[in-house]
Amino acid sequence: EMFPLTLFSLGGMMIFPAADNFVTLFVALEVMSLPLYIMAATARHRRQLSYESALKYFVLGAFSSGFMLMGSAFLFGFANSLRISAVGAAIARGTNMDWMVLIGVFCVMVGLLFKVGAAPFHAWTPDVYTGAPTPVTGFMAAAVKVAAFGAMIRFYTAVAAYLQWDLLYIFAGVAVLTILVGTFAGLVQDNVKRMLAYSSIAHAGFILMGILALQKGGTGHVLFYTLGYGLATVGAFGVVALVRGRDAEGNVLGEAPSLSKWAGIGRTNPWIAGSMLVFLLSFAGIPLTGGFIGKFVVFSDAIKGGVGWLAIVGLVASAITAFYYFRLVRVMF
């Protein structure tokens, strides 16, 4: 059943960032999300943890869908249209019903922020990434996040950008909180999957920073960062799925996400360790990697967009996150 569910979810992901109608946006969100709730509960060796993570994802996902519907209703009441472009045009013309627009945009953005795992809507991310089967986790961490950020960019450029100065500090605060949570919570993790989960939260903050400071051509920069992050994430979780524990007799056991189980992999299996090293270097933004180019263009856009203080926060956090990436490298080698 995994292949049909994956195809349904992929279909929703393709429609989600392309939707120009709030009904289509919501239907695409549900088509994308409902298969994931089932897929998250399919782990065979840790069923209880998998069921718990799937239930948490489902309940919190229902709240995010509710916020998106409520925001769509407010924006429909304001513009008398369900088309996203029509709502943006109505805001550009100006009106006295600013409160409806602000509440509507805020609620829709909350629904999208949940899907990208931004703080304070990130509570599901570490548990779901840990409890779900690792291939499903990689799919969620990469494909879902790319689709959600694509939808957010479309909505922000069409609607929210007209209210940038009204909502800037709220969403800038969300970006800073997301970066800080992903950075400092990841420092204390001894489980590789949870560490990568908090890494994904920190990267969501960096991408949010780029969206808030969109410049001419900046959409391409954000999409490049998102694509580079997605490819590195798929690779990293693919490596996690290959690392297996062994018992005293040398028999191969299930996955071994515990950090202690990765000790010496660089000597016993240098290809796996070398692949993981490349992905971690990209996460850290080391020069000559796609992650470095993505961070460079996004941070440059933030400085040009008048939120240089956000870029400073991002640079400091990026240096701190490198610590737990290189801690894993030290354990492997």
Language-model region placement:
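Alpha-helical transmembrane segments of multi-pass membrane proteins predominantly involved
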Residues: 1-333
